[in-house]
């Protein structure tokens, strides 16, 4: 029996020493999640959670089997906040409140923190951070060490990326590390419009379910009103929160109208009343707070201290609700997001078929794909990877069924590794965030955690 074992050094990230809490294979209750997020409030950022440190699972490969092919889908690594207006909105609101004398001492202090954060982020919205590059280099190192024969000599590696720069930079960091390990590798990189049909495909139904006017948004608003109470936070920041409502609406509207991107239509400000605008400000402050973990140079700055543990938990619930309903397997969503992943699943099957049809070592033993959180979430749900596809119909329990920070933190990934013996039998190993995972396929296991490829392929084709 052969063992593939990777020891991962402890790094100063956020998962917590010795806590494999990122795993998606168990269903915690709400109280457990409250405690988990209170212990690590960075997790309240959901998909903003930085790739966690884990001990890689040890794998014992059955005797006589050798690695023959590997394919993967990886989310881009840690980045700055997605949109400039997130920083601009906070700056605009606090500048107005400061001019009108409506900031408490804490509010004035927070304004200075926001100015520093905004200056740090200027020109970088949505961009891969240096931490994001390091995440992908580390994953590449572990991958190459796990199956070194696939990265030996002048092996050909093909890498394909979404056309979005943070994905291209993630691909560059990953493949650069592979070349550092073995300069003889022949690496081909692609970021072309045609590849977007599988790397980042959005069906018409997926667009519809994501619209502001989609019917499920009423449920979302009801949940927000029941969970998000900005009263305490705003009272800590403003001398007269009630008197600031009109200024909030004006400041936010002006932020949207001033952020027209070249060549794009102006984004309309959301139609929100005073209470909703207060909730929006709370959300934006939280968005900025949780993104600090994803960048270098702000280690001595925090905004998470502004929120109570319960506020962090509730803000996370709303982020999680949105991702779960639009992209995973929530009851009533018509599986619109999941079905968009069929193109990527078809791609994974096709590249495996091509590689395995060749005797001996394939022409391209490694096929890498770099894309986005939503598309990985959809793929994992479509495949029914453990912990990633539970169906729940009660919005109050979405958080128990599915947790975005487990399923798709920054740099999340799915790896599929194929092993073949001299008789031509093929076994398959699936890894989610570098941990062994299972699929609901009866009688397909050769022995945990391996699947017979013939049974696995039949199962995957049934999802198309």
Say what each PLM segment does.
Residues 20-156, 162-367, 371-464:
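Signature for phosphate-centric chemistry
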Residues 1-24:
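Bacterial Sec-dependent N-terminal signal peptides
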């Amino acid at each position: 029996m052969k063992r593939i074992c990777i020891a991962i050094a402890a790094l100063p990230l956020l998962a917590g020493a010795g806590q494999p809490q990122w795993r998606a294979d168990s269903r915690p209750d709400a109280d457990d999640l409250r405690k988990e997020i209170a212990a690590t409030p960075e997790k309240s950022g959901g998909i903003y959670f930085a790739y966690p440190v884990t001990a890689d699972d040890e794998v014992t490969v059955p005797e006589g089997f050798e690695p023959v092919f590997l394919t993967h889908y990886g989310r881009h690594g840690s980045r700055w906040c997605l949109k400039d207006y997130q920083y601009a909105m906070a700056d605009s609101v606090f500048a107005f409140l400061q001019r009108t004398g409506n900031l408490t001492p804490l509010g004035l202090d927070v304004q200075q923190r926001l100015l520093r954060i905004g200056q740090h982020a200027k020109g970088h919205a949505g961009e891969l951070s240096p931490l994001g590059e390091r995440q992908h280099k580390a994953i590449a190192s572990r991958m190459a060490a796990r199956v070194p024969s696939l990265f030996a000599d002048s092996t050909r590696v093909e890498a394909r990326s979404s056309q979005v720069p943070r994905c291209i930079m993630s691909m560059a960091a990953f493949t650069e590390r592979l070349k550092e390990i073995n300069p003889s590798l022949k690496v081909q990189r692609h970021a072309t419009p045609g590849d977007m049909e599988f790397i980042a495909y959005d069906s018409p139904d997926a667009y519809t379910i994501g619209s502001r006017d989609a019917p499920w948004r009423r449920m979302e608003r009801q949940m927000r009103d029941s969970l998000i109470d900005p009263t305490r936070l705003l009272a800590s920041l403003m001398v007269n929160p009630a008197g600031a409502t009109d200024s909030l609406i004006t400041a936010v509207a002006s932020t949207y109208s001033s952020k027209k991107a070249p060549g794009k239509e102006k984004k309309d400000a959301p139609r929100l009343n005073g209470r909703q605008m207060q909730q929006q400000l709370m959300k934006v402050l939280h968005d900025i707070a949780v993104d600090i973990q994803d960048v270098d140079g702000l280690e001595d700055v925090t905004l998470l201290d502004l929120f109570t543990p319960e506020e962090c938990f509730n803000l996370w619930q709303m982020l999680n609700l949105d991702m779960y309903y639009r992209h995973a397997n929530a009851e009533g969503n018509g599986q619109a997001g999941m079905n968009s992943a069929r193109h990527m699943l078809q791609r994974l099957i096709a590249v495996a078929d091509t590689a395995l049809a060749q005797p001996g070592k394939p022409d391209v033993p490694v096929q890498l794909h770099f894309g986005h959180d939503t598309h990985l979430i959809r793929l994992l749900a479509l495949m029914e990877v453990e912990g990633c596809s539970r169906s729940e119909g009660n919005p109050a329990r979405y958080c128990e069924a599915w947790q975005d920070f487990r399923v798709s933190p920054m740099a999340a990934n799915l790896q599929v590794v194929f092993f073949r013996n001299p008789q031509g039998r093929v076994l398959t190993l699936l890894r989610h965030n570098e941990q062994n995972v299972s699929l609901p396929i009866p009688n397909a296991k050769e022995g945990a955690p391996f699947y017979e490829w013939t049974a696995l392929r039949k199962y995957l084709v049934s999802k198309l």
